[in-house]
Each structure stands twice: as structure tokens, then as C-alpha cells.
Amino acid sequence: LSIAITAQAQTLKAPKETAMDRFLRYVKIDTQSAEDQAAVPSTKKQFNLANLLVKELGAIGAQNARVSEFGIVYATVPGNLADNSKVPVIGFISHMDTSPAVSGENVNVVIHKNYRGGDIVLPKDPTQVITVEKSPVLKELIGDDIITADGTTLLGSDDKSGIAEIMTMVDTLMQNPQLK
């Protein structure tokens, strides 16, 4: 199976935008929630990202892209099986709100290129340190790029990274109808 996937992957058209590029755009959109609100979503600014996602879904060819009164984004990637066979529908779900505890406004992204190991000090607030002791997974990321905020805001990776992955997957599926 992995050989077939690898061979097929070589013929795939790339998405219009990488997941990382999408993520870097999405984290700059403030979607901070509010604990003291009963409304869903708890802040109107969450619609800013929701409406952008609907626009992008339409541009990449997803059908019936829309946002509900509750800020939930829906879209359909049409089936492409020749025999119109009935197959299970799959939903991909991610939230877009960020923590009310830390600001999500004016996010400044820092990309730590080719991480060399050790603790990561956030540049605008040196008291904010991601330590190897508390985050031992850093040991596995040596040589990779690590994305953080500058220490003055929340990055919003939970779960804008998930949204970026879902949007990139939809883009890839729409550009590659040979995928079944």
C-alpha cells in the first residue's frame, strides 16, 4: 500500500498554498474567546477567520461553503467515484477560538530555523522560555524549524494548525480528482 501511495504522490499537483503559509496567515487573525460570554461563538471576532475560510474554500472549489450563526464553517468536497457508490461521509473538525487567558491580537510570529537544541527564549519577553525539561519533545526536533510567538501574545497554534491542515487537504483533494 505505501508503495502505491508513494508512486501516486509523485504525480499530485501541489496545493495552491502550503499548510505552513496558511498557518502563518491564520495566527495573525485574533480569535480570542471570552469566558464570561454564553453566546457561541463567545466573541464576534471569531467570524473574521470563519468568513475568510468560507471565501478560501469557495476559491479552491469546495461546494456549499458557508458559516453558521454559531461561527461553524461547513463545506463539501464532492465525491468523485465513477459508480456513485455509497461510501461513508467523513468530517474534519477543528476549533478556531484561542484562549481567553492571553491576547491573540497583533501576533508576531518567530520562526526558529534549524533548531539546534536547548531552551527557546521568546525574544520580546525573556521570562517566557520553552525549556527542554518541561518540553522534552524538543529533543526530537533538532534540525527542524519551530514556530512560536514573540512572547507578547499567544501564538494560537491550538488549533489554527489543524485548520491550516484541513484547508490544505481540501485544496489538495480539489486539485487532484484522481484521488479517490
Task: Give residue ranges: language-model regions.
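Bacterial N-terminal signal peptides
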Residues: 1-4
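Boundary at the C-terminal end of the N-terminal hydrophobic targeting segment
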Residues: 7-11
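Generic structural signal for well-ordered, non-membrane alpha-helical segments
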Residues: 12, 16-19, 42-46, 50, ...
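N-terminal capping segment at the start of a domain
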Residues: 16-44, 148
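Predominant activation on well-ordered alpha-helical scaffold segments within soluble catalytic domains
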Residues: 20, 24, 51-54, 163-171
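Generic secondary-structure signature for well-ordered alpha-helical cores
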Residues: 28-32, 55-63, 171-179
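A non-catalytic alpha/beta surface segment that caps or lines the substrate-entry region
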Residues: 38-87, 91-93, 97
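Active-site metal-coordination/substrate-binding segment of hydrolases
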Residues: 84-179
